[in-house]
Amino acid sequence: MNPVLQNILTRRSVRAFTDKKISREDLNLILKAGIYAPSGMNKQTWQFTVIQNQNKIQELAKAIGKSLKRDANYNFYGPDTIILLSNEKDNSNGLADCSSALQNIFLMANELGIGSCWINQLKTICDELEIRSLLNSYGIPENHIVWGIAVLGYPEKPNEIKPKNESVIKFVD
């Protein structure tokens, strides 16, 4: 099978991670894959904010959980690393740009044996006082919205490959 297709077919969202740390070398490869994603008119107005400090990860998870009235133990599934992808609020391509970058991140992580999951709840609560204060402290510009968070870590168990619904494909003659 084509190795690119094999990587796409085996990538799954991982929601349970081990304590193993991601090396800086692997993290740099993942980030390089992300920044090489397409962006509208190649403007590359996004920002990739990497957090490996567990206290900061839990601080953000707790604030998001509180805002969304989630379980007190909300923790992004216990990843080693998170990458917040943000873009200018007035950029009409911001969501698409960050989504493309996230997919590249997920595929590169999968290729390296690193699990990932897309956390998307932050986009609607970025400007709540507590959340914005944290984002500012992480260096995310005031005029940015966080379109997604890539949570990364080594999977606790192997990915289960499930078939997808291929009936959604329609050809027009």
What is the predicted function of each stretch?
Residues 1-173:
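Acidic, surface-exposed loops and disordered segments
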